[in-house]
Structures are given as structure tokens and as C-alpha cells.
């Protein structure tokens, strides 16, 4: 479905595709997830894919879950709260979108669901991904995996 998402990577990718096509190399720009991050004061905010309302408008039957987790192993110094909101489709089980906010670890974590969206992964498959663990960077169950496993219960 057509959309307008004014992000630098998408503009660059579109420019390269236009140049390639002009030079006779047929290139098609693949779909986008609208992945974006920003920081406001101490909070990192990130999104990729569809929100619940966007999913409904696109004809999906969305289910969603919101979880609160820690950015690092709970006993590790400096662990901060992260809130994850994940959206999936009840009919297909497909992951549709993820939104996150927290003081650390959000901007880099959003990359995993962005790749999952590009690959059109299901929520169950995403919940089985092997995300890295080390106490200074993540709890054993990464907040994204916790969200996916909770969302599976609603699909």
C-alpha cells in the first residue's frame, strides 16, 4: 500500500534506484516498514511496521501486547525500564509492528523486528530467534522475545 515516510535511508535508496533505472539497470524499491528512532531528553523512542490503528486500516485483524521489562539483567547495575508494544495479525500470525520506549537499548533493539518485518516472519518464528544475551546488554529473555511470547497467547 502506498505511503509517505520521509526518512533519509528511504530517500537514498530511492535515489539510487532512480539512477540505476536511468542507466538501464532495472531496480525496484522493496516495501518499507517505516522504521524510525529518536531521542527526547533521556528517552529513546523507536517504531517499525504498523500500529494497531494502522493495521486495522490496512485490513488486518490485529492483536497487540504491551510489556514492561529491563534493558539488562535485573541484577546488573544500570538496568533501565523498557516498554515494548508489539502488534500481530490474528489471521496469519504475522508480525505487523513494534513500538518501544526506554532510557537505553531501544534504538538498537528495534532493528530485530525491522528485519523480521522485511522477512515477513510470524510472531511465533520471531519469538524463537536467537537474540544475543550478556548481562550488561540484555536479560536472558530479551524484552522483544518476552513481548512476542506474550503476543502468541493472543493470536
Where do the model's predicted regions map?
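Flexible, glycine-rich terminal cap/loop adjacent to redox cofactors
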Residues: 44, 48, 57-155
Amino acid at each position: 500500500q502506498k505511503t509517505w515516510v520521509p526518512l533519509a535511508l528511504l530517500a537514498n535508496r530511492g535515489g539510487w534506484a532512480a539512477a540505476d533505472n536511468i542507466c538501464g539497470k532495472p531496480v525496484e524499491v522493496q516495501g518499507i516498514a517505516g522504521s524510525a528512532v529518536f531521542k527526547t531528553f533521556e528517552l529513546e523512542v523507536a517504531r517499525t511496521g504498523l500500529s494497531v490503528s494502522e493495521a486495522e486500516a490496512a485490513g488486518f485483524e490485529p492483536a497487540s501486547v504491551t510489556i514492561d521489562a529491563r534493558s539488562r539483567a535485573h541484577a546488573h547495575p544500570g538496568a533501565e525500564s523498557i516498554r515494548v508494544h508489539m502488534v500481530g495479525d490474528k489471521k496469519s500470525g504475522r508480525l505487523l509492528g513494534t513500538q518501544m520506549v526506554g532510557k537505553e537499548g531501544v534504538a538498537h533493539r528495534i532493528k530485530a523486528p525491522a528485519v523480521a518485518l522485511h522477512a515477513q516472519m510470524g510472531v511465533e518464528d520471531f519469538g524463537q530467534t536467537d537474540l544475543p544475551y550478556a548481562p550488561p546488554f540484555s536479560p536472558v529473555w530479551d524484552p522483544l522475545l518476552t513481548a512476542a511470547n506474550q503476543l502468541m497467547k493472543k493470536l
